[in-house]
UniProtKB/Swiss-Prot annotation:
Residues 1-25 form the Alpha-carbonic anhydrase domain. InterPro entries: CA_dom. It comes from the Bacteria. Releases silica from silica-rich substances. This is Bioremediase. Belongs to the alpha-carbonic anhydrase family. PROSITE patterns: ALPHA_CA_2 (PS51144). It comes from Thermoanaerobacter sp. Transmembrane segments: none annotated. Its cofactor is Zn(2+). Has a potential use in the concrete technology for the development of an inherent and more durable concrete material. Residues 1-25 are annotated as: Disordered.
Amino acid sequence: DFPIANGERQSPVDIDTKAVVQDPA
């Protein structure tokens, strides 16, 4: 959960970071 990615204005970097964090499951 990043403040920049809070709401509909999500930065590509934040979205990519979340994907990477949830990837190693």
